From Swiss-Prot:
GO cellular component: cytosol
Catalytic activity, as annotated: CMP + ATP = CDP + ADP; dCMP + ATP = dCDP + ADP
GO biological process, one term: pyrimidine nucleotide metabolic process
Keyword Transcription: no
InterPro entries registered for this protein in UniProt: Cytidylate_kin, Cytidylate_kinase_dom, P-loop_NTPase
Pfam families: Cytidylate_kin
Protein name in the entry: Cytidylate kinase
Binding site for ATP: G12, P13, S14, G15, T16, G17, K18, S19, S20
Length: 229
C-alpha cells in the first residue's frame, strides 16, 4: 500500500469518544476526517423539517431524494450544511438524536449516504472515516479497521457531562436509558446492524483517557498499514 493513501475505518457505538478520537487521529496522520453519523443526522433533520412520519419508511425515503446537503472533511472543525445553512449545532439536538436511528434504518437512506461516503473516502487520499458500519459495509477493504467500545454506563456519564457543559441539565438516568435504547436499535436493525468487522481491532475506552486511546490507535495504524506516526 502506498503511504500517501490510507483509509482508517472507525466504528463503534455512541459515547465511546469516537468523534474526538477520530478527529485527533486524523490530524496526527495528516488525513481528512469524515463523520458519517453527521450525514445521517443531516438527513434526519431534513426529514423532521419536512414533517415526515417517522413510522413511514417510504415517506422518509422520498423526503431524502435530492437531499440538499454538504459536509466537509477538515478534521479541524465540523462543516455541515443543509439548504446552505450551517446546521452543525442543530443536528446534535435532542430531536435529531431521538429520531436518527429510525431514519438511518431506512434502506434507501443508507444506500444514498453509503454511496456518498464511499465517494468522499476514495477522493480523500488519507482519511479517517467514523461511523457504525464502516468496516463491515461502507469500506470493507479499508486499510485499518478499529472498533471503539465502552460500557453503557461510561458512555452515559460522558454524554451527561457534555449535556451539563452545554447547559442541557443533569439527568443521568434518562441519558443511560437513551444509550441503551439506541444500542438495541442499532444492533438489531435489519440493515447494517452495529457490530465489529471480523478483522477489526477492538479498543475499550471505558477507563482510558483520550491521549492513551490516541497512542494505542497510532500503534494499531502503524502495525496494520506501515504508516508511521
Amino acid at each position: 500500500m502506498s503511504t500517501s493513501s490510507l483509509i482508517v475505518a472507525m466504528d463503534g457505538p455512541s459515547g465511546t469518544g469516537k468523534s474526538s478520537v477520530s478527529r485527533m487521529l486524523a490530524r496526527r496522520l495528516g488525513a481528512r476526517y469524515l463523520d458519517t453519523g453527521a450525514m445521517y443526522r443531516i438527513a434526519t433533520l431534513h426529514v423532521l423539517r419536512k414533517g415526515v412520519d417517522l413510522a413511514d419508511p417510504d415517506a422518509i425515503a422520498d423526503a431524502t431524494v435530492g437531499l440538499p446537503w454538504s459536509i466537509g472533511t477538515d478534521p479541524a472543525g465540523e462543516q455541515v450544511l443543509l439548504d446552505g445553512e450551517d446546521v452543525g449545532e442543530e443536528i446534535r439536538g435532542d430531536a435529531v438524536t431521538k429520531a436518527v436511528s429510525a431514519v438511518s434504518a431506512v434502506p434507501a437512506v443508507r444506500e444514498l449516504l453509503v454511496a456518498a461516503q464511499r465517494r468522499l473516502a476514495c477522493e480523500a487520499g488519507r482519511i479517517v472515516v467514523e461511523g457504525r458500519d464502516i468496516g463491515t459495509v461502507v469500506l470493507p477493504d479499508a486499510d485499518v479497521k478499529i472498533y471503539l467500545t465502552a460500557s453503557a454506563e461510561a458512555r452515559a456519564q460522558r454524554r451527561n457531562a457534555q449535556n451539563l457543559a452545554e447547559g442541557r441539565g443533569d439527568d443521568f438516568a434518562a441519558v443511560l436509558a437513551d444509550v441503551q435504547r439506541r444500542d438495541h436499535l442499532d444492533s438489531t436493525r435489519a440493515v447494517s446492524p452495529l457490530r465489529p468487522a471480523d478483522d477489526s481491532v477492538l479498543v475499550d475506552t471505558s477507563e482510558l483517557g483520550i491521549d492513551d486511546v490516541i497512542g494505542r490507535l497510532l500503534l494499531v495504524v502503524s502495525e496494520r498499514s506501515g504508516v508511521g506516526q
